[in-house]
Amino acid sequence: MRLMRNLMNALLLGAAASSLAVAADRDGEYRLNELQSTDAGYRKAWQNLVEDESRLPDWVMNLSGTATPMHAVDDQGDKYLVGGLCEKSDCKGQRLLVAFDWDKSHAYGLYVQVPEGLPQDKSPSKHASFRWLGKPEPAVQKILDEQLKADPNWY
């Protein structure tokens, strides 16, 4: 009987670990430019953010640029789905980094613009303009800033 109980516990633990691994892998299935059409919660959070912002380009308003896979970020128990997007014709000069609360209630962004024609020997990070969207708290700002700095072309 004890053997059967141990076997059942092992099976349950294995199933739980497997489902956690699948959930962790699924975050990479999403891309920022697909979220609005696939999930009403993300769409509403993004619409709430952009309605309070002025003078944003269409590709930012509609999340219609070129996107990288999104990933989960856990910051001391607060979880976010984070991803990046850039303007299709100007990925080096026009970027957007976005974090959604895990419950999809809020979206936050970092809109980054690098001046056109910046010489290759100039650091984009020293010449860029940064605009926070959605009034992110310092912890979310740090997450988005780290996402930007993780790009090997950002120096």
UniProtKB/Swiss-Prot annotation:
Q: List the disulfide bonds.
A: 86-91
Write out the transmembrane intervals.
none
| Database matches in InterPro entries | Inhibitor_vert_lysozyme_sf, Inhibitor_vertebrate_lysozyme
Which keywords are on file for this protein? Disulfide bond, Periplasm, Signal
The keyword Amino-acid biosynthesis belongs to this UniProt entry's keyword annotation = no
According to the record, the signal peptide region is 1-23
Gene3D superfamilies, per this entry? Inhibitor of vertebrate lysozyme
A Pfam family this protein belongs to? Ivy
Where does the UniProt annotation locate this protein?
Periplasm
Listed GO CC annotations: periplasmic space
Q: Which family does it belong to?
A: Belongs to the ivy family.
> What is the name of this protein?
Uncharacterized protein PA5481
Q: Which organism is it from?
A: Pseudomonas aeruginosa (strain ATCC 15692 / DSM 22644 / CIP 104116 / JCM 14847 / LMG 12228 / 1C / PRS 101 / PAO1)
Question: What does UniProt list as this organism's lineage?
Answer: Bacteria, Pseudomonadati, Pseudomonadota, Gammaproteobacteria, Pseudomonadales
